[in-house]
Structures are given as structure tokens and as C-alpha cells.
Amino acid sequence: MSDHAEHAADAADTDAPEGDDAGGDDGEQAGDDGTSALSERVRALDADNADALADDVAALEARVETLTDELADAEDEVADLTERVQTKQADFKNYKERAKRKQEEIRERATEDLVERLLDVRDNLDRALDQEESESDEDGIREGVELTRDEFDRVLETEGVTEIRPEPGDSVDAARHEVMMRVDSDQPAGTIVDVYRPGYEMSGRVVRAAQVTVSEE
């Protein structure tokens, strides 16, 4: 081989590695650029997802707040309705109790009115007995009148009617005694001397006050 040919071969060997190094650098640069672009896209997607997630969370929080307000309003309405129902129930209960008391009062008043009228009949029986004491009793009239009066008294007792007949010397009770007159007496001044007509009470209520005479003061 000539000197010129050897020189050309050496030159070719020397230039070949330099060409390979340049190609490698270009490949590495292209790879770095691709990775950077991918990273940017990932970061952009993450940002978009974060924004969307934040919007979803905000919407959910607003919905929760709205539902909480609606629940509070519903609870207030339920409480108000419950209170109104309880008030109505209490009013109805009170009405029933008042109606029951009214019925009882009407019944008692009707019974009292009847008893008061019947007491006049009993007074007549007493008067008949007083008259019979001074007359003959050949026909047994007195006994019949006494039996009638006794039966009458049993009926009154069954209805809860009791007699008001104060004793001499008792104090005057304005609610149960009616003073007919004042007389001279050995009883203490202002006390009862005698009973002119007995009174009656029914279930603790005075149907007719006893008529009495009172010692003068």
C-alpha cells in the first residue's frame, strides 16, 4: 500500500468516532425534550383535575349547607306542629272535663230542684202528724203517715240528702241557717234557740237552709 493510501485510511479512522458521538448527543437531547413535554402534560392534567375536584367539593359543601338549612326548617315546622297538636289535645281534654262537670252540675241541680219540691211534701207529712197527735187515731192514719214519712226519708238518704237541724245553743251559720226571728231566751246571746223548719243539704251543698229562732243579744 502506498503512503498516500495509508494516510487516507488513518484519516477515515480518526473521523469515524467523532461522527458517532454527535449522533448520540442529538438522541439524548430529543429524549429529554419528550420527557419534559410529558411532564408538562401531566402537570396540566393534575391542575385541571384539582380544579374540577375543588369545584365538586365546593358544590357538595353548598348542597350540604342547603340540606342542613332545609332540615332545620323542617325540624322547626315539626316542633311547631307538635306543639299545636299538644295544645289542641289539652284544649279538648279541658273541654271534655268542663262538659263532664257541667253535666254533673246539671244533674245535681235537677236533683236538688226535685228534692226541694219534695221537701214541701215532707213538711206536709210532719204537719199531718202534728195534727193527729191531738185527734183520735181509730183508723190508723197516723201510723200510715209515719210509714210514708219514714220511706220518704230513706229515699232522701239514698240521694245523699241529709237534714240540717242545729241544737239549741249552737252558733248561727249564715250559709246553713236562716234566722226567722230573735227571742228572749236563756241561751247565750246570738245562738240558736229553736228550729222552726229543718234544712237539708245534698252532697255538701245546701238545698234548703234551716229556719231558726235566735236568742236576742
Curated annotation (Swiss-Prot):
CDD domains: GrpE (cd00446). It comes from the Archaea. This is Protein GrpE. Participates actively in the response to hyperosmotic and heat shock by preventing the aggregation of stress-denatured proteins, in association with DnaK and GrpE. It is the nucleotide exchange factor for DnaK and may function as a thermosensor. Unfolded proteins bind initially to DnaJ; upon interaction with the DnaJ-bound protein, DnaK hydrolyzes its bound ATP, resulting in the formation of a stable complex. GrpE releases ADP from DnaK; ATP binding to DnaK triggers the release of the substrate protein, thus completing the reaction cycle. Keywords: Chaperone, Cytoplasm, Stress response. InterPro entries: GrpE (IPR000740), GrpE_coiled_coil (IPR013805), GrpE_head (IPR009012). GO terms for cellular component: cytoplasm. Signal peptide: none annotated. It is found in: Cytoplasm. Residues 1-10 have a biased composition (Basic and acidic residues). One of its GO terms (molecular function) is adenyl-nucleotide exchange factor activity. Belongs to the GrpE family. Residues 12-31 have a biased composition (Acidic residues). Homodimer. One of its GO terms (biological process) is protein folding. It holds the Pfam family GrpE. The keyword Translocase does not apply. Residues 1-39 are annotated as: Disordered.
